């Protein structure tokens, strides 16, 4: 079962569990949870020393599917130890690849300025067609730049006492995407939020 299904607007809301592990909830504008990712625990996480950056996450869909995301310079995504995809930095941008290295889509460098509270990255198909935009929320005010429908997601957004690496991510697609690309983009919402990853030309 694909994680995104037919959803075209997905918010990745970043919070913490009681054990201090980062948690990213992927929801639609009406509040439906598509999946949630949980950082692998440990003493460094519990004590607040591992606050984002390179780490392992489990992305669990509402249908029970689990993906493992190893967030790093090149992020790998696996499904039951089978490579599903990778997020690879490339020329100031990112490639979204399948498990065999075939490019599914490309994330372009941010449009705007480094000081912006929201960094917008256009997502293009290998043929150059725009598929959507993945936005990294660098500040709480970044959500204000988003249209009202998606901004409603912020109403239930909790700001934790331990500073988070970002304020989440928003994925807006022009149309539903194939399931494999959808799963990689769901993982990208986690990756962008917790690394936090932004691409600058």
Question: Where are the regions that the model predicts?
Answer:
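Low-complexity or membrane-interfacial segments used for flexible interactions
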Residues: 1-56, 82-83, 91-93, 99-201
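Hydrophobic/aromatic-rich structural module bridging two neighboring secondary-structure elements via a short loop
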Residues: 55-83, 89
């Amino acid at each position: 079962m694909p994680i995104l299904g037919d959803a075209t607007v997905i918010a990745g809301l970043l919070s913490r569990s009681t054990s201090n592990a980062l948690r990213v909830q992927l929801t639609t504008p009406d509040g439906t949870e598509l999946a949630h990712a949980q950082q692998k625990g440990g003493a460094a996480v519990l004590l607040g020393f591992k606050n984002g950056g390179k780490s392992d996450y489990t992305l669990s869909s509402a249908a029970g599917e689990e993906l493992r995301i190893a967030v790093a310079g090149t992020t790998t995504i696996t499904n039951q130890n089978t490579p599903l995809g990778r997020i690879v930095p490339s020329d100031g941008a990112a490639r979204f690849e399948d498990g065999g290295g075939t490019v599914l889509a490309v994330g372009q460098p941010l449009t705007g300025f480094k000081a912006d509270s929201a960094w917008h990255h256009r997502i293009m198909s290998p043929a150059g067609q725009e598929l959507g935009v993945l936005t990294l929320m660098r500040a709480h005010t970044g959500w204000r730049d988003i249209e009202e429908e998606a901004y409603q997601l912020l109403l239930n957004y909790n700001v934790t006492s331990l500073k988070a690496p970002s304020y989440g991510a928003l994925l807006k697609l022009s149309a539903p995407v194939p399931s494999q690309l959808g799963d990689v983009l769901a993982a990208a919402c986690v990756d962008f939020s917790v690394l936090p990853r932004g691409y600058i030309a």
